[in-house]
């Protein structure tokens, strides 16, 4: 057996944490799971993903969950992290022999496979964001700073602390920043802010080159050896150098545990799979498990393992427990754990600061919008400059007012990609209990509303004065108010579409169709009194119609058309010819405001209920 002996790393002796900045409240935790099973129903057919998986991981151990695709690795990790929100779960998860309590999500950190980070902020700012939201309120600024510096040293990124994360921004803008391996270490660092006792990672080396993967694994090894952290991670076909870093290997096949220990090669050799020379142990084990799966032996081997040393180890680790002490997971797998360390207002302030930095540093958020507004405003001004109040001027004034409103619902198309690009980040951070939906939404909308106000005023002001529209100050500010509200209503409506649809392309297609309907039934192309009765409702629920009507009232009521005759039409006659209502412009202002507020509320509801990380 010596020729196939692969020695795994030995388990280090636990270390004590002494200073507050190292979170002295952290305890060394042993995680025990017994008879875990998980199933989902797909098209009325029940699929068993995990079947009777048991094991114990002690402090200072670095355990790999290994197996072919579809064997249940990520599912097991989700259950251990208490983040499985769908399907049926049964079994027990114990921490130091006790059932999971409200502190579990503070003691356990889960690092997902994808590096979900905001590209425009720096490494230090990212860690500070997590520190502000995850650390207790009692921590001072100095203590938070010390903690962040410790983490930067732990993950080996002190020299890159002020570098931006980097990535592709909406619109295809590439922001240079960290490498893939460095981003992965930042993700791990975010999970270490609270100095957790248990760290769970889903394929931490996936997609990384050899050097980056080894750097990530060395970070995890140091966590176990220096901090006595319990680390469990899924992994897929690692290099032999990485494979040897693990203290134990957990092998899954078809949802069953077919091996758990520190001598996997010897085990699979004993059950009939000779180990070829010069072979990566990970590849060898994967080939063996694939053969076991093809031969239908997974249940047999798992049952034999369960009845032997694994079952004995579990009994020894929890021999003093009664059945009532087992942390049995309910059928839905859901637990209501209040894992927020800070209130809604604190969450809002932290999110407001980060969102502000992102808006300033992302050109697509403001600069591009404002530049487009200036260009379109100058174009409108050139086409409609110096309009008079004669019959031709009335027609041109009506046109410029209409197209101003239409532009207010076309500009928000830029918001769709910006909003959708942040969805994955929002879902991941909310699932990690960093913050609630409400403070995130309010912080995001604070800057979105500012951008909308700026865009409306830039475009509206340039066009207003070039076209020589009604010069009264009250007329100007009312027009700007209507344009701003129309822009906000259009922006919020496009965000509703982006919440309901999944892809950016779909959102653009649906948004374009809706915008066309808005234009057609706004009262400019087709007079309201010329519409078929069956279509009348389309303009009553059209905020573009009310916006256009308000601007027309503002521009023409009280004015007289210069027609060169004794009896010239008045401004109200102009409105009547278009079939516009005689309601006051103040009423229209209230109606458009109501549309904007209703859409604003609907965006929040869609964001809160439609988009959750599905696990």
From Swiss-Prot:
Keywords: ATP-binding, Membrane, Nucleotide-binding, Transmembrane, Transmembrane helix, Transport. It is a multi-pass membrane protein. Coiled coil: none annotated. The keyword Transmembrane helix applies. The keyword Ribonucleoprotein does not apply. One of its GO terms (molecular function) is ATP binding. It is found in: Membrane. Residues 31-279 form the ABC transporter domain. Gene3D superfamilies: P-loop containing nucleotide triphosphate hydrolases. Induction: By hperosmotic shock provoked by sorbitol. It comes from the Eukaryota. GO terms for biological process: aggregation involved in sorocarp development; cell motility; sorocarp morphogenesis; transmembrane transport. PANTHER family: ABC TRANSPORTER G FAMILY MEMBER 22 (PTHR48041:SF81), ABC TRANSPORTER G FAMILY MEMBER 28 (PTHR48041). May be involved in cell migration. This is ABC transporter G family member 22. The gene is abcG22.
């Amino acid at each position: 057996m010596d020729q196939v002996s692969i020695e795994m790393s030995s388990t280090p002796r636990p270390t004590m944490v002494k200073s507050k900045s190292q979170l002295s409240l952290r305890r060394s935790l042993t995680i025990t799971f017994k008879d875990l099973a998980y199933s989902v129903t797909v098209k009325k057919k029940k699929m068993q993903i995990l079947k009777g998986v048991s094991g114990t991981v002690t402090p200072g151990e670095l355990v790999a969950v290994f197996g072919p695709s579809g064997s249940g690795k990520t599912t097991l990790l989700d259950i251990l992290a208490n983040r499985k929100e769908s399907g049926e779960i049964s079994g027990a998860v114990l921490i130091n022999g006790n059932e999971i309590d409200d502190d579990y999500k503070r003691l356990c950190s889960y690092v997902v496979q994808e590096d979900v980070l905001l590209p425009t902020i720096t490494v230090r700012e990212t860690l500070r964001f997590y520190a502000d939201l995850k650390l207790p309120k009692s921590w001072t600024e100095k203590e938070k700073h010390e903690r962040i510096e410790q983490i930067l040293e732990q993950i080996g990124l002190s020299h890159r602390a002020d570098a931006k994360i980097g990535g592709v921004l909406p619109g295809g803008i590439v922001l240079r920043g960290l490498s893939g391996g460095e981003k992965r270490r930042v993700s791990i660092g975010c999970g270490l802010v609270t100095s957790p006792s248990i760290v769970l990672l889903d394929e931490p080396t996936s997609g990384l080159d050899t050097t980056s993967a080894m750097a990530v694994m060395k970070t995890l090894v140091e966590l176990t050896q220096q901090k006595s952290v319990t680390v469990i991670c899924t992994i897929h076909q690692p290099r032999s150098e990485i494979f040897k870093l693990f203290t134990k290997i957990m092998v899954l096949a078809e949802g069953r545990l077919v091996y758990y220990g520190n001598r996997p090669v010897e085990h699979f050799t004993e059950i009939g799979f000779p180990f070829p020379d010069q072979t990566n142990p990970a590849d060898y084990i994967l080939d063996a498990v694939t053969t076991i799966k093809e031969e239908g032996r997974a249940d047999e081997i798992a049952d034999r393992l369960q009845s032997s040393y694994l079952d004995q180890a579990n009994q020894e680790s929890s021999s003093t427990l009664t059945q009532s002490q087992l942390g049995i997971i309910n059928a839905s797998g859901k637990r209501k754990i209040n894992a927020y360390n800070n209130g809604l207002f604190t969450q809002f302030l932290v999110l407001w600061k980060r969102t502000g930095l992102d808006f300033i540093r992302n050109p697509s958020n403001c600069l591009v919008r404002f530049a487009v507004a200036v260009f379109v405003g100058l174009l409108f001004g050139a086409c409609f400059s110096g309009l008079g109040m004669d019959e031709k001027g009335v027609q041109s004034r009506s046109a410029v007012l209409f197209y101003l409103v239409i532009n207010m619902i076309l500009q928000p198309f830029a918001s769709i990609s910006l909003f959708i690009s942040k969805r994955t980040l929002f879902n991941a951070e909310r699932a990690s209990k960093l913050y609630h939906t409400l403070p995130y939404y309010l912080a995001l909308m604070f800057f979105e509303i500012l951008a909308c106000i700026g865009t409306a005023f830039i475009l509206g002001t340039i066009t207003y004065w070039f076209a020589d529209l009604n010069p009264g100050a009250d007329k100007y500010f009312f027009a700007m108010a209507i344009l701003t509200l129309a822009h906000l209503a259009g922006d919020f409506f496009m965000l509703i579409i982006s919440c309901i649809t999944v892809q950016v392309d779909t959102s653009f297609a649906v948004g374009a169709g809706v915008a066309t309907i808005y234009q057609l039934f706004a009262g400019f192309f087709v007079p309201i009194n010329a519409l078929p009765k069956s279509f009348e409702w389309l303009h009553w629920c059209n905020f573009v119609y009310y916006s256009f009507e308000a601007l027309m009232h503002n521009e023409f009521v009280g004015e007289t058309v210069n027609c060169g005759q004794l009896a010239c039409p008045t401004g109200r006659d102009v409105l009547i010819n278009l079939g516009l209502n005689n309601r006051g412009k103040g009423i229209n202002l209230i109606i458009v405001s109501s549309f904007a507020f209703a859409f604003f509320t609907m965006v929040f509801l869609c964001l809160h209920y439609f988009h959750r990380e599905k696990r």
